[in-house]
């Protein structure tokens, strides 16, 4: 019999992560690299493991992720969102705890666009009264 696989798609800023959960030992692979190798920041690795901590399933699933777009922070948020959605397929009873932790909600914050006449989105050149 084929091993059960659970899939989820996560998004954050410009990053899109396609996540597959397979029952296993807790190994996380991102774009065919180990998690520690792909994401060097420890705090972002904690962000990725949040859904497992909330549902008490640490070390129960191997995670295979394909992620494109964005930087480290956006990709970590997208992976977290994807893992949370995949865990929902594992057990629908996780919905309440994941929702309460805010892990099922797509973070809608995006980069503010640059306005004409300004140097950046809000930064203006120095004002001189005289």
UniProtKB/Swiss-Prot annotation:
GO terms for biological process: translation. InterPro entries: Ribosomal_Su5_D2-typ_SF, Ribosomal_uS9, Ribosomal_uS9_bac/plastid, Ribosomal_uS9_CS, Ribsml_uS5_D2-typ_fold_subgr. It holds the Pfam family Ribosomal_S9. Coiled coil: none annotated. Keywords: Ribonucleoprotein, Ribosomal protein. The keyword Ligase does not apply. One of its GO terms (molecular function) is RNA binding. One of its GO terms (cellular component) is cytosolic small ribosomal subunit. Belongs to the universal ribosomal protein uS9 family. This is Small ribosomal subunit protein uS9. It comes from Streptococcus thermophilus (strain ATCC BAA-250 / LMG 18311).
